[in-house]
Swiss-Prot record:
Organism: Malacoplasma penetrans (strain HF-2) (Mycoplasma penetrans)
Annotated Low complexity bias: 100-124
Domain (SSB): residue spans on this chain: 1-99
This protein's record includes keyword Thylakoid: no
Protein name according to UniProt: Single-stranded DNA-binding protein
UniProt GO molecular function: single-stranded DNA binding
Regions of compositional bias (Basic and acidic residues) in chain numbering: 155-166
Disordered: region residues: 100-126, 143-176
InterPro entries: NA-bd_OB-fold, Primosome_PriB/ssb, ssDNA-bd
NCBIfam families cross-referenced by the UniProt entry: ssb
GO cellular component: nucleoid
Length: 189
């Protein structure tokens, strides 16, 4: 399952684009910190499409606190210098404004105007005065409801599904298989 849930603030105003086919796109960066280490902030690039992008472009601004529900994707493009650039970003499936740094009137305006048509879960699409921990609890309960009805596959079916995935580990064939995470040390301070 590919699912991402992040609570954080917009690091900049949304960047609006329209594709050659006339589809609206919004790009934002979410700044979030760990509960245990408030001194370290992480920035997550995010993209939204169509009605979700229209909502973001119309109502959200730098500094607004939001809860994002989405999925992680990897894409590539060729830079102006001719180099292939690989990007990992979050595709926003739904977004819920939690508070605005700009004004209190923005919240009531968001409530009235945002009615998503392309999101699967409207629970995260409307304004709320929830705290971050309440938003996370709400997400976890909705996530548990969704996954409890999910059909679990057998181990053989799972092997079949991931047989072409070079990153999938199959510990049944090699019980001593170990994945080294030493490369993560270069990102630590």
């Amino acid at each position: 399952m590919n699912k991402v849930f992040i609570v954080g603030r917009l690091a900049q105003d949304p960047q609006q684009f329209v594709t050659q086919n006339g589809i609206t796109q919004s790009r934002i960066s979410i700044a979030s910190s760990d509960n245990w280490n408030k001194n370290e902030t992480y920035f997550f690039p995010c993209v939204a499409w169509q009605s979700t992008a229209n909502f973001i472009n119309s109502y959200l601004h730098k500094g607004d606190l939001v809860a994002i529900d989405g999925k992680l994707i990897r894409r590539s493009y060729v830079s102006k210098e001719g180099k292939t650039v690989y990007v990992i970003e979050i595709v926003i499936e739904s977004i819920k404004p939690l508070s605005s740094k700009n004004s209190n009137n923005a919240a009531s305006s968001i409530d009235k105007n945002y009615n998503p048509t392309n999101t699967k879960n409207n629970n995260y699409s409307q304004q709320s005065n929830m705290s971050v921990s309440e938003a996370m609890d709400d997400f976890e309960s909705n996530f548990a409801q969704k996954t409890s009805s999910t059909n679990i596959t057998s181990k053989n079916e799972e092997k079949e599904t991931f047989k072409d995935d070079p990153f999938a580990l199959n510990d049944d064939e090699d019980p001593d298989q170990v994945v080294s995470l030493d490369w993560l040390d270069e990102f630590k301070e």
